[in-house]
Amino acid sequence: MRLRHVVSSLDLTRDDYFRIFELVDKFSNVKKLNYLSGKVVSLAFFEPSTRTAQSFHTAAIKLGADVIGFASEESTSIAKGENLADTIRMLNNYSNCIVMRHKFDGAALFASEISDIPIINAGDGKHEHPTQALIDLYTIYKVFGEIDGRTFGLLGDLKYARTVNSLLRALTRFKPKKVFLISPSQLKVRREILDGLNYPVIETENPYDVIQDIDVLYVTRIQKERFVDEVEYEKVKESYVVDLKLVNMMKKDGIILHPLPRVTEIDRKVDKTTNAKYFYQASLAVPVRMALFYEVLGERKDD
């Protein structure tokens, strides 16, 4: 069954995740295919992006699709006063799928409710970023050969980081042993996210208390752009730095992931350790998004 909209990590079942993982394996080393020849993908980035926009663009081209779109709200008619609904309706006339990033929570869900073509959420405010969770989980799957039974540690800004929300929700489709949530008290995971989880969660402020138990350390930057109060940001902006001291306490086969961009939360010296997998993680963005495009737009025998 073809996927419709991908607004949240919860839009994918466990079977969906594994089916996409199999497709990523097939797409990882290809130069160009024609599976989406004749299709048009709209990249509707109302909020600026570099890595996400470019990887979606590349993924679509490598599958043979044409790509249209915009890289900021200022380059659209919204700058002239057009509302979001009308913009989405217009893009429906030009394309077969909309990849959308927006600064407001829930914008992708709103778009999916009025769109006749699939919406893929490329990040909406502090809400979700489901395709990043796909990349995260595929990285873990490739490194360990499994996701079930692993102990996770999510460190940093767990309140505003949409990548954290999507990963936590995606993990409900698997069987993690437990998840440590490591953050300052001001940046804890929001209650509405915690209430939907079905696995053991332990909150702490000290990574040194739990680092020896962690298989996957997922680090996020402090989201300066999400803070309303500059003073509050200054209080927490350098709460944690993953350095060699911390890494040397990890399991030998433990891994460090980061959705990027990185600021100061991971010391550059960590890059050369065998635990650092965040650049490998980033290298998987294109084939993962190719697999998702194929699931959403590709011709399938069961359609």
From Swiss-Prot:
GO aspect biological process, one term: 'de novo' pyrimidine nucleobase biosynthetic process
Documented EC number(s): 2.1.3.2
The keyword DNA damage belongs to this UniProt entry's keyword annotation: no
Gene3D superfamilies: Aspartate/ornithine carbamoyltransferase
PROSITE patterns: CARBAMOYLTRANSFERASE
Binding, carbamoyl phosphate: 51-52, 101, 129, 132, 260-261
Keyword entries, A-Z: Pyrimidine biosynthesis, Transferase
SUPFAM superfamilies xref list: Aspartate/ornithine carbamoyltransferase (SSF53671)
Binding site for L-aspartate: 80, 162, 221
Superkingdom in the source lineage: Archaea
Pathway membership, UniProt: Pyrimidine metabolism; UMP biosynthesis via de novo pathway; (S)-dihydroorotate from bicarbonate: step 2/3
Catalytic activity as recorded in UniProt: carbamoyl phosphate + L-aspartate = N-carbamoyl-L-aspartate + phosphate + H(+)
InterPro entries: Asp/Orn_carbamoyltranf_P-bd, Asp/Orn_carbamoylTrfase, Asp/Orn_carbamoylTrfase_sf, Asp_carbamoyltransf, Asp_carbamoyltransf_Asp/Orn-bd
Pfam families referenced in this protein's UniProt entry, alphabetically: OTCace, OTCace_N
This protein's record includes keyword Transferase: yes
GO molecular function: amino acid binding; aspartate carbamoyltransferase activity
Function: Catalyzes the condensation of carbamoyl phosphate and aspartate to form carbamoyl aspartate and inorganic phosphate, the committed step in the de novo pyrimidine nucleotide biosynthesis pathway.
Entry similarity comment: Belongs to the aspartate/ornithine carbamoyltransferase superfamily. ATCase family.
HAMAP family in the cross-refs: Asp_carb_tr
NCBIfam families, A to Z: asp_carb_tr, PRK00856.1
Quaternary structure (record): Heterooligomer of catalytic and regulatory chains.
Name of this chain's protein: Aspartate carbamoyltransferase catalytic subunit
Biological source species: Saccharolobus islandicus (strain M.16.27) (Sulfolobus islandicus)
Taxonomic lineage of the native organism: Archaea, Thermoproteota, Thermoprotei, Sulfolobales, Sulfolobaceae
